[in-house]
Amino acid sequence: MGKIIGIDLGTTNSCVSVMEGNEAVVIPNAEGKRTTPSIIAFVEGGEIKVGDPAKRQAVTNPTKTIASIKRFMGHTFAETQDEAKRVPYSVVKGDNNTPRVDIDGRLYTAQELSAMTLQKMKKTAEDYLGQTVTEAVITVPAYFNDAQRQATKEAGEIAGLKVMRIINEPTAAALAYGLDKKGNDQKIAVYDLGGGTFDISVLELGDGVFEVLSTNGDTHLGGDDFDQVIIDWLADEFKTEEGIDLRLDPMSLQRLKEAAEKAKIELSSSAETEINLPYVTATASGPKHLVKKLSRAKFEQLSDTLVKRSMEPVAKALKDAGLSTSDIDEVILVGGSTRMPRIADEVEKFFGKKASKGVNPDEVVAIGAAIQGGVLSGDVKDVLLLDVTPLSLGIETMGGVLTKLIESNTTIPTKKSQVFSTAADSQPSVEIHVLQGERAMAADNKTIGRFHLDGIPPAPRGVPQIEVTFDIDANGIIKVSATDKGTGKSHDIRIEASSGLTAEEIEKMKKDAEANADADRIAKERAEKLNEADSTIFQTESQLKELGDKLTDDQKTAIEYALTELRMAHQSQDLDAIQKGLDNVNAAWKTATEAMYAQGGDQGQQAAPQQEQSGDNVEDVEFEEVK
């Protein structure tokens, strides 16, 4: 079995790790960084950039630079309207009511775009390990529903990875934190505030068992939202002063986004920061500049409601676990957004204790995923992970009520059955409407699938017995079956959300992703060949100046002719012609240098007799070394 890598697929940044012996190692990317921005850019010539190269060109290419795509995963188009208004790229309605990103008329799903980041992580691991990687453990926010988990698994498949396990981010963090603390029984709370999502999980650790007691969260709360309050403040201030809304121009909006993120980070260590955006826009009267000072106090005032929003799920998770704050032994802060001082202060105030600073908030989730990969491959022994389903599961019954079969915070894997009946006389079929959520009425919860059980024999209402069974695997992915107990007729499906992809679509996207990888490889080879030609032209010109007087006219002419051909090929960017030009230049130089050395050899032979003659007078003598 090959290595199973662990990937933290984040809203803002992603990270990859692998077990090396008894330790999980975070793998640096090609740019030498331990985390990679979850950003994809489509540039001229069809090239796709991922990570830091994509982030660097975002300001000049805002409508084709995709960030925070995780916030669209597993959602319908209608559910993402607010998110779509906050990004500079175009989000349109696609097949199956899915949100798609429009790039020059080609519509990309969130899964396809996330797969590009996963491919980068896969390649990073392969370069480090020196072998092909095909298996991975991928993390998701604990509060992701079934559709979002399915979408993450699909992204992995498109990237060419077999997803061995979907693991919750706070659980992964706890695994990384507690692996070396097997002897101590303790209860921990993991507060995980990332770029786009928030989770809180309460776990019990002891003797290698990691048991999740409860989880809660908000999949629409993260660092992006803290950036947004700064963006809105800057835009509103500028609009008041200049009468221009910078949010309406994609390039200005992208500059605001970058400035807001930078200001937020600076305010974690400084009391005040200056935001300076020269030439942010222009009017008939000339260019306009934005210069504002933002204090930490003002930022905390702007983001106060967001901080309070995060504390509501914390209280709920603690209540669901049946614990009080005094029962919690350790509080762990995970996710880059927890570096904001106000967050740490609020969490410490709630729990009445200092938060642990023993983990790197950007890397701990990927490390935990790698450890889980080690557990699955047998490299890590004596570790048992017991996770829970974050949301209740049930079906719609008469009157539009949600009847729950599996309550939230039930340990997974799990299976539960319940018998239902028909609502009308001689009803020939039943529709099983599967939902996820905590509200009493079906309409207020998330639909994750529908299917029909047909062929029910005519009978009065309430007589047929329809057994509905929910089966949740260790990934938190749901399978539902319905059986008519009278006829034995059954129907079962692995839930494919209405916003999901078909197997055919996934296969097509997988092939497209492979083609993109080939295109990237070709683009890289092209760039390398052009660089080689450029370097050869420069070196040849330098050597001609330096060694020109030692070459014959014919040798010089041959090299200059080959060099002219190579220059022309380089200008036309014809790779075949460039290779031919390189071969010709090298061949011309080889002929010239061989002649030079041959000539030098003849001179050496003529000098040899003199050396022999002078050697006749050499005598051996003894000498004493003076120390």
UniProtKB/Swiss-Prot annotation:
Keyword Secreted attributed: no
InterPro entries (alphabetical): ATPase_NBD, Chaperone_DnaK, Heat_shock_70_CS, HSP70_C_sf, HSP70_peptide-bd_sf, Hsp_70_fam
Low complexity bias: start-end ranges: 596-615
Disordered as annotated region, ranges: 596-627
GO molecular function annotation: ATP binding; ATP-dependent protein folding chaperone; unfolded protein binding
Reported induction: By stress conditions e.g. heat shock.
Post-translational modification Phosphothreonine, affected residues: T197
Disulfide bonds: none
Annotated keywords: ATP-binding, Chaperone, Nucleotide-binding, Phosphoprotein, Stress response
UniProt feature, compositional bias: Acidic residues: 617-627
Family indicated by similarity: Belongs to the heat shock protein 70 family.
Purpose of the protein: Acts as a chaperone.
Record's protein name: Chaperone protein DnaK
